[in-house]
Amino acid sequence: MEEYQLYLELDRSRQQDFLYPLVFHEYIYGLAYSHDLNRSIFVENFGYDNKYSLLIVKRLITRMYQQNHLIISANDSNKNRFLRYNKNFYSQIISEGFAIIVEILFSLQLSSSLEEAEIIKSYKNLRSIHSIFPFFEDKVTYLNYISDIRVPYPIHLEILVQILRYWVKDAPLFHLLRLFLYDYCNWNSIFIPQKSIYTFSKKNPRFFFFLYNFYVCEYESIFFFLRTKSFHLRLKSFRVFFERIFFYAKKGHLVEVFVKDFFSTLTFFKDPFIHYVRYQGKSILASKNLPILMNKWKYYFIHLWQCYFDVWSQPRTIRINQLSEYSFHFLGYFLKVGLKHSVVRGQMLQNGFLIKIIIKKLDIIVPIIPIIRLLAKSKFCNVLGNPLSKPSWADLSDFEIIARFLRICRNLSHYYNGSSKKKSLYRIKYILRLSCIKTLACKHKSTVRAFSKRLGSEELLEEFFTEEEEILSLIFPTTSSTLRRLHRNRIWYLDILFSNDNDLINHD
């Protein structure tokens, strides 16, 4: 027991982290806004020159401490223009400063922990989200039940701040952080207070998702502890993800909550065939055993969110489905388990017989309809999938137009190359290829048929498309049997770190 307590305790040098002075260091904001800083805030609103000044941040923090939050005047926005611009400045500057400070701290802790565990190489190889799908192919076909879980958002930002407070002991920093969040939410939620956390997540995504990740890691740490029990304490590679302060007090509270509803609940949690996968706010929980164990895990999540995080979640939001009769979306793919029938002819002496074999197979399919809707939203085609030209790109050079279409096509093909059925992917390539030709024909004031005949003899196009044989195969039909075999097989890449379709078709 003493060994476990020593493991769960933070190092004393890390308990005394004093980060508050970093708020007043100019290089912190230089790191945060070296590329994203909106200079119009300073030039138009404050009258400063283009050079960033730390004096603005200091004055704003002083105003935050001196401002009386109990008195709200209806004419404040008219009387004090500087205060009105302060609110934009809080959301764009100070929140990014907080994000940089805590990111630097925890990136150093993560790097040191990975170095001690000697797993840096494997950690980098497992960062790709495509590494999840080979895991699905190996494990899911042997499982029977699956549950699709949506991680609920916290109802108040204070919950996120408290979770971060367990890791960093710095009272002045968190006092300023609470003051900033209170001031921001009070200003942006005078009329609609329920949307304060939603507004903050949209205007300050970097800082919000940093806090949200800690919220997710907090409940997952207890989940992993119950899943592996004391065995996880010897896994050094995971130690940075487990909370150590007040851990056993929280565990005792969970046991007390569970005993009220289930007798010896924790003793039935042992399930060697359970698998858990999460990306962002969506989790997949699958098991081979009876659904009663899945049902216990379901109520574990609900009680944990309600009793510990004050997040309301209802049992009917988490459904347990039989895997053979259920299909689900994950990371931009449509997944379902199908049955593959095969017949094998056998012969024993003079007697011949047929053996029917049924094999479970995981089908990973490209969701063609959502992608077409996204392309239609970006004006590459209409809602029916008919290609359209991009008149807004007509002012660009031919090379730039082709490069943009190639980039989009390469991104989509790169990400969806693991599909088991490539016909949908070929349709997407056809839409982009014909949209590219229509855009070029519109620019040169020609018809699509006439421009298509010129396309084969265009030197610029030939040089560009023959630069990479893979890129050539994405836009034009290929005659190479080798490339055709590659296109029929699943290909998973280890360099994909995101799955946002909006980023896949973004030409910038």
From Swiss-Prot:
Principal localisation: plastid
Organism annotation: Lotus japonicus (Lotus corniculatus var. japonicus)
Purpose: Usually encoded in the trnK tRNA gene intron. Probably assists in splicing its own and other chloroplast group II introns.
Signal peptide positions on this chain: none
Keywords assigned by UniProt, alphabetized: Chloroplast, mRNA processing, Plastid, RNA-binding, tRNA processing
GO molecular function, one term: RNA binding
Protein's recorded name: Maturase K
Subcellular location field: Plastid, Chloroplast
Family, per entry: Belongs to the intron maturase 2 family. MatK subfamily.
GO cellular component terms listed in the entry, alphabetical order: chloroplast
InterPro entries with a match to the protein in the record: Domain_X, Maturase_MatK, Maturase_MatK_N
Phylogenetic lineage: Eukaryota, Viridiplantae, Streptophyta, Embryophyta, Tracheophyta
GO term, biological process aspect, one: tRNA processing
Pfam assignment, any one: Intron_maturas2
